[in-house]
């Protein structure tokens, strides 16, 4: 069974055999002068089959997915030109193919024998692959950040980012890492030591709005609305009473005038 990608409104899901994984809609956060890398990929992760310029995907293989401990499909690129005889690989005998596949599998198993259940290692490169790989991570994925050459790390916490549910939505946590020039490292280090851990606090507590604030705002709005409604109803009631009183007085006046004229005619 092949994995499929399902887009439903603003939510993205990956459907793989025996797995329903929600995708992280955004890429991991960028840290200046640092790069990130996943040491392993969770079950359901998707990698686009991208080819470098002048080449295209072969057999319409759009992506490969992490299923269990291995990647489904194999990305292949072929030349866009009609004369691509040099890019064609001479077919090998079936026995030689099987032997080569077996050797490759043994080599892969020996290197990645510590694979975690439900995780895949970095997929092997393919010919004419694009320089940048585009992954679609799933919830629970962890990426590790490292400073580029010429920079050193200043960190108050783990230099990792995790795709997880925060405040009811899936997002990446921000890595506690700052990369500074090696020549200025000692200056920043002294500043960091003076600050200590004053600014360190869990992201879940810092990012989520306080429920009490929303409740107080809602209560205030409700009270204001009730006051407005009460004032308007009061004005309507007063106006109705005045109108009724004037009607009674006017009716009484007409009645008295009618009786007075009648009594005068009798006399």
Curated annotation (Swiss-Prot):
BP-aspect Gene Ontology terms: activated T cell proliferation; activation-induced cell death of T cells; inflammatory response; inflammatory response to antigenic stimulus; interleukin-2-mediated signaling pathway; lymphocyte proliferation; negative regulation of inflammatory response; negative regulation of lymphocyte proliferation
TM ranges: 236-256
Chief localisation class: membrane
UniProt keyword list: Disulfide bond, Glycoprotein, Immunity, Membrane, Receptor, Repeat, Signal, Sushi, Transmembrane, Transmembrane helix
Biased composition (Polar residues): 82-93, 192-215
Cleaved signal peptide residues: 1-21
Start-end of Low complexity biased regions: 98-108
Residue ranges that the UniProt entry lists as topological domain Cytoplasmic: 257-267
Disulfide bonds: 24-66, 49-75, 51-77, 120-163, 147-179
Membrane topology: Single-pass type I membrane protein
Region (Disordered) location: 82-108, 191-215
Any one Gene Ontology molecular-function term assigned to this protein's record: interleukin-2 receptor activity
This protein's GO CC annotations: cell surface; external side of plasma membrane
Role of this protein: Receptor for interleukin-2. The receptor is involved in the regulation of immune tolerance by controlling regulatory T cells (TREGs) activity. TREGs suppress the activation and expansion of autoreactive T-cells.
Protein known as: Interleukin-2 receptor subunit alpha
């Amino acid at each position: 069974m092949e994995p499929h990608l399902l887009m439903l409104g603003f939510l993205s899901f990956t459907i793989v055999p025996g797995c329903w994984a929600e995708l992280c809609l955004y890429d991991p956060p960028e840290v200046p002068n640092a790069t990130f890398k996943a040491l392993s990929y969770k079950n359901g992760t998707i990698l686009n089959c991208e080819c470098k310029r002048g080449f295209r995907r072969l057999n319409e293989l759009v992506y490969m997915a992490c299923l269990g401990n291995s990647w489904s499909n194999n990305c292949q690129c072929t030349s866009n030109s009609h004369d691509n005889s040099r890019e064609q690989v001479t077919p090998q005998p079936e026995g030689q193919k099987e032997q080569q596949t077996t050797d490759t599998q043994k080599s892969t198993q020996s290197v990645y024998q510590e694979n975690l259940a439900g995780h895949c290692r970095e997929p092997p490169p393919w010919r004419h692959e694009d320089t940048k790989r585009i992954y679609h991570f799933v919830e629970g994925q962890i990426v590790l950040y490292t400073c580029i050459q010429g920079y050193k790390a200043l960190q108050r916490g783990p230099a990792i980012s995790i795709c997880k549910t925060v405040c009811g939505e899936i997002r990446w946590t921000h890595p506690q890492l700052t990369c500074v020039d090696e020549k200025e490292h000692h200056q920043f280090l002294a500043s960091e030591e003076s600050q200590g851990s004053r600014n360190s606090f869990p992201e879940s507590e810092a990012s989520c709005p306080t429920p009490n604030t929303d409740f107080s705002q809602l209560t205030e709005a409700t009270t204001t609305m009730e006051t407005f409604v009460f004032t308007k109803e009061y004005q309507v009631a007063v106006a109705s009473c005045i109108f009724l009183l004037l009607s009674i007085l006017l009716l009484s006046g007409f009645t008295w005038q009618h009786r007075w004229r009648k009594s005068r005619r009798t006399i």
